[in-house]
Amino acid sequence: MTLAKDIARDLLDIKAVYLKPEEPFTWASGIKSPIYTDNRITLSYPETRTLIENGFVETIKEAFPEVEVIAGTATAGIPHGAIIADKMNLPFAYIRSKPKDHGAGNQIEGRVTKGQKMVIIEDLISTGGSVLDAVAAAQREGADVLGVVAIFTYELPKATANFEKASVKLVTLSNYSELIKVAKVQGYIDADGLTLLKKFKENQETWQD
């Protein structure tokens, strides 16, 4: 199996991902979705966690070999980022969604120097808005953000457009297309469910029509 398939299988097995094409979830954005993902659960499963962290390390070495500092998004990217930085013997920082309203008012915790080549770790990409805010915060502090690496992406067109607009490279360990294929093979969904899941990827507004 490839890394993308292995991670997709594990996410399904540990119930970090739920697929309910017939009874969709409602996201915070209001979108009705056949999938719900909580990758924080991966931290509770050592084998899955190790698979993911090793995948991150190999992916970063291949895609961003010049990296000098790892940063995690608060809060989901922090534990993964800290483990990765430790494995790669690199400095670590984390980026808040907004500056603290007390003390020094920091948005980035940890020491980041001007021009330092940074890779930002995220657990899940939906539209990409929150992690791209983190990228912008790091750039304001003078970091040279090489790109974002995430565990999983829904592959939504809006995310692709947002990353292209921001001129930020995105690499993920697994993705929606791989996951629904694995889900069908392993019996998590039937043929009708697979059809609905494919329609969701094509159009998040009309997939139920």
Curated annotation (Swiss-Prot):
GO molecular function, one term: orotate phosphoribosyltransferase activity
Catalyzed reactions per annotation: orotidine 5'-phosphate + diphosphate = orotate + 5-phospho-alpha-D-ribose 1-diphosphate
Annotated EC: 2.4.2.10
Pathway(s) annotated for this protein in UniProt: Pyrimidine metabolism; UMP biosynthesis via de novo pathway; UMP from orotate: step 1/2
Top EC class for this record: transferase
Superkingdom field: Bacteria
Subunit structure: Homodimer.
InterPro entries xrefs: OPRT (IPR023031), Or_phspho_trans_dom (IPR004467), PRibTrfase_dom (IPR000836), PRTase-like (IPR029057)
Cofactor: Mg(2+)
Binding site for orotate: S126
Keywords, in A-Z order: Glycosyltransferase, Magnesium, Pyrimidine biosynthesis, Transferase
Function of the molecule: Catalyzes the transfer of a ribosyl phosphate group from 5-phosphoribose 1-diphosphate to orotate, leading to the formation of orotidine monophosphate (OMP).
Binding site for 5-phospho-alpha-D-ribose 1-diphosphate: R96, K100, H102, E122, D123, L124, I125, S126, T127, G128, G129, S130
Protein name in the entry: Orotate phosphoribosyltransferase
Family: Belongs to the purine/pyrimidine phosphoribosyltransferase family. PyrE subfamily.
Lineage, broadest ranks: Bacteria, Bacillati, Bacillota, Bacilli, Lactobacillales
Example GO BP: pyrimidine nucleobase biosynthetic process
Pfam families: Pribosyltran (PF00156)
Protein's organism: Streptococcus mutans serotype c (strain ATCC 700610 / UA159)
Annotated SUPFAM superfamilies: PRTase-like
